[in-house]
Design a protein with these regions (language model features):
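Outer membrane beta-barrel
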Residues: 1-113, 129, 138-145
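Short linear motifs in intrinsically disordered/low-complexity regions
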Residues: 3, 66, 72, 116, ...
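Detector for outer-membrane/organellar transmembrane beta-barrel domains
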Residues: 128-166
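Short acidic/glycine-rich loop or secondary-structure boundary segments that cap or lie
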Residues: 56, 116, 155-159
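Extracellular loop and loop/strand-boundary signature of outer-membrane beta-barrel proteins
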Residues: 22, 81, 118-123, 158-161
């Protein structure tokens, strides 16, 4: 939807197991991706449940450009196999991508609470909750692509909540 000099969009993506029809992603209705985004001259801001930059799927997954084992090959190439984190998709997330400049694109992502379905007791963005951050650069020129990405999981500290290890 155009709103002046910006556009607002959304993605609602659900998944199911093809062998038995059961809902995927822990029973979430839109467990694959559920985000709203605003884009304009300065890039795109995303909010919601999003796959990581260090992933080969989702709206901002950079590894799909360079993965020898894309997501279609199962766990080996899935987002859970390409990141050091316990999660492939992240709840309560903000992400930003500035515009592409001469084939170079950047992205940053921060999740205030990585998994709000299994972690129902902790506060967002506190030492009680698993938090996650990622950043990436992607360069594309014709059929060539180079990706540099990093991620960091700040695991919760339920035994000593006053100590914030992340």
């Amino acid at each position: 939807e155009d709103i002046g000099n910006a556009k607002v969009g959304f993605v609602l993506e659900s998944g199911f197991n093809s062998d038995d029809g059961a809902s995927g992603q822990g029973g979430r209705l839109f467990g694959r991706e559920a985000q709203v985004n605003v884009s304009g001259a300065y890039g795109t801001l995303y909010a919601g449940r999003i796959a990581s930059i260090v992933s080969d799927s989702g709206s901002i997954g950079y590894l799909g450009d360079v993965s020898a084992f894309p997501n279609a090959f199962g766990f080996v190439g899935s987002q859970a196999g390409s990141t050091g984190s316990a999660y492939g998709r992240y709840d309560t997330t903000l992400a930003y991508q500035p515009p592409v400049f001469s084939g170079l694109q950047a992205a940053v992502l921060y999740s205030f609470k990585a998994d709000s379905k299994t972690d129902t007791t902790s506060r967002e963005n506190s030492s009680f909750a698993d938090r996650y951050a990622a950043a990436g650069l992607r360069y594309k020129a014709g059929k060539a692509a180079v990706v540099l990405a990093a991620d960091y999981t700040m695991y919760s500290n339920a035994t000593n909540p006053d100590l914030d290890d992340g």
